[in-house]
Amino acid sequence: MRCVPVFVILLLLIASAASIDAQQKTKDDAPLTSLNDNALQQHWNKRCCPRKIWCCMIPR
């Protein structure tokens, strides 16, 4: 019966540790949303016709 309170405390500590960042962010870190936006923008640019501007405005 002595182990039950210790076990409960350990479970609470493990659950609260998941919300803590393991590593601090550096100035070189970029959020994933900006990476996804860049990939979509590059994909859109490849679909555009270089000589016909109206082609870029038509969603496919």
From Swiss-Prot:
* Gene Ontology terms for molecular function: toxin activity
Which residues, if any, are the signal sequence?
A: 1-19
Pfam families from the xrefs?
Answer: Chi-conotoxin
Q: In terms of domain of life, where is this protein from?
A: Eukaryota
Q: In which tissues is it expressed?
A: Expressed by the venom duct.
Summarize what the UniProt record says about post-translational modification.
Contains 2 disulfide bonds that can be either 'C1-C3, C2-C4' or 'C1-C4, C2-C3', since these disulfide connectivities have been observed for conotoxins with cysteine framework V (for examples, see AC P0DQQ7 and AC P81755).
One cellular component GO annotation, for this chain's record?
extracellular region
Q: Report the subcellular localization.
A: Secreted
Keywords assigned by UniProt, alphabetized: Cleavage on pair of basic residues, Disulfide bond, Secreted, Signal, Toxin
Proregion span(s): 20-47
Q: What is known of its domains?
A: The cysteine framework is V (CC-CC).
Concerning its family, UniProt says: Belongs to the conotoxin T superfamily.
> In its UniProt entry, what is this protein called?
Conotoxin Pu5.6
